Amino acid sequence: MIETIRKAWKVPELRKKLLYVAFILVIFRLGNNIPVPFINTTALQAYFNAASTSILGLMNVMSGGSFGTATMLALSIQPYINASIIIQLLTVAIPPLERLQRDGGEAGKRKLEAITRYSTLALGLLQGFGYYMLIRTNGFLSDTSVWAAIVIIATFTAGSVFVMWLGEQITGMGIGNGISILLFAGIISRLPSAVFYMYEGAKNWAAGKESGGTDVVLHPVMIPVFLIGMILMLVFIVYISLSERKSPVQYAKRVVGRKMYGGQATTIPIKVNMSGVMPIIFAQTIASIPATIAAFVPSMSDSTFIRLFDTTSVIYCVVYALLIVGFSYFYATIQFNPVEVSNNLKKQGGFIPGYRAGRPTAEFLSKILNRITLFGAIYLAIVAILPIVTGAIFRISALAIGGTSVLIVVSVALDTQKSLEANMMMKQYKGFLN
């Protein structure tokens, strides 16, 4: 990745794009530090430290910590991600939207993007109101007037729309997917606080305390163990992210005039983790609904149902893993349609050796997809569940979303690297591929 950036920096046009991305990221980080008035951020931050394993903790990590301090960009990319998920689901369930996506071309793509923007605005308003109610219910407001409510909700909503706009600027004028890069920047910005968290835990152990400022006691010997474990997880995630099953494709020869065309061989790559991190995000959102309800309605926090779905309970982990498997299959079928791929091969005169074009090819690809997706789903479940179990055993809540964070960072880094390489190939800089 660093070598790719170094080579891209030598290309004037790509250097401008990289500088533009850096400029947008500076604005994004500045916005993450502008406080919203009328909120006791110290008490709110302590509350989020206690709720770090819930969906609120995940939102705080994905926002770069701004959600836990109620800054102007507290909602960050969450409304946009939720809007994108909803639109993806609706394009499968509603035929007109499906036709618009499939047959609409560039105009259809722009219409879906406009729908996603308006949905982001609506969800930003809804989540801004919900966040305001969370802050108000727990007594973190210095002013409970209607005017204060309007200012707070409007600021949160405007911040979510502004983040969406920043992401679109990176996508249009920079490198890679803008929203993903903002998500990457938010997670990376939490790295210093995670290091400090582990340092405080070791210091508390040395002092013989039961708890400290970070509410954790950590044996110093465990710090290198966790670091080695994180490195091994990073290597594992990179390896699986780059793994794919290649099915050979042969194209029939045809004669046009005096020349012969076709006959070349290629492959159809099917990635092990085709759906990326989306199954984890969506599964955690649903599995954490009881804990989120308890956060917004404190009177329900002692109910048996809420306790059963505590984010460190066995039931939560089982439901979470099953949801990840289910959504992995769902997103895999959205991104790779065996019937559509088979029909396209048939139209282009291609076939998979040993299988007739049409239905046999579709059945073969579907069989391969199901097997690959099962392995990918189990891999995602392990990445998501293992840090939760480890964090519960060693009483380190910050580990609970460590696997998800590493997976997001790796996925975005690899996608951005591919985007840089594609831009360099367009400029005929291919030496880095050797």
Predicted regions and their residues:
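N-terminal cationic and glycine-rich segments that engage phosphates or anionic surfaces
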Residues: 1-434
